[in-house]
């Protein structure tokens, strides 16, 4: 049986085509890697200025300029690996400037794009702070309640979130709920860093604070005869 082999030119053209595709793939990967490094470096540079801008000695002009840089960087590179962290820091700068709606918008970006649970939790709590600063206690309460539902006693920010929730409940006039939250906090954290403050709030609200359990005595060593 006669087999028709491809002409040598066809084989050469096909080989060149495969080589070209491979070269494009390698070049594309190299370009992507280079671009990601460039974007990462840009974020790192601006974020360094953002941290410095939040120092007490930083001027309002500095904070405004850095906030604008963060805003522009996020708009140019919204899918950058550090976009969520940058949005969170932008929110902090806007919050410090008492621009609460703008801060809330930045925090919402951090929540939407954050791969880190810590960044998302911080941003979600900060949304509650913006509502509280605007004296919209009902929305602040909703925000803190949503965060508290997703956290357990072993989670980062659990203690602070319950304190925020109880404070919002007080401000919203829901005294019984605030008492329950404070008591829950003391139950989960008998040795909480702010236990005295929490007990003080319970006394102010006319509720008894849970009595801390006495420390358990260490087991005595067996007597050898």
Question: Which role does the model predict for each range below?
Answer:
Residues 1-19:
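N-terminal positive-inside, membrane-proximal cytosolic segments immediately preceding the first
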Residues 74-83, 97, 111-120, 148-157, ...:
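Short solvent-exposed coil/turn linkers within tandem alpha-helical repeat scaffolds
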């Amino acid at each position: 049986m006669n087999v028709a082999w491809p002409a040598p030119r066809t084989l050469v053209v096909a080989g060149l085509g495969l080589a070209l595709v491979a070269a494009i793939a390698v070049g594309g990967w190299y370009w992507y890697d280079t671009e990601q490094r460039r974007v990462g470096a840009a974020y790192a540079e601006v974020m360094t200025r953002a941290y410095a801008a939040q120092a007490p000695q930083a001027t309002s002009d500095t904070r405004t300029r850095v906030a604008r840089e963060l805003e522009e960087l996020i708009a140019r590179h919204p899918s950058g690996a550090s976009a969520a962290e940058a949005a969170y820091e932008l929110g902090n700068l806007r919050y410090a400037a008492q621009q609460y709606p703008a801060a809330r918008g930045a925090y919402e970006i951090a929540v939407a794009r954050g791969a880190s649970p810590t960044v998302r939790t911080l941003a979600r709590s900060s949304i509650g702070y913006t509502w509280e600063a605007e004296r919209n206690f009902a929305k602040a309460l909703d925000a803190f309640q949503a965060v508290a539902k997703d956290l357990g006693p072993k989670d980062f920010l659990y203690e602070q979130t319950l304190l925020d929730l109880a404070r919002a409940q007080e401000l919203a006039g829901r005294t019984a709920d605030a008492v329950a939250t404070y008591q829950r906090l003391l139950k989960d954290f008998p040795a909480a860093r702010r236990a005295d403050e929490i007990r003080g709030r319970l006394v102010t609200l006319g509720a008894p604070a849970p009595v801390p359990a006495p420390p358990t005595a260490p087991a005595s060593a067996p007597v050898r005869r």
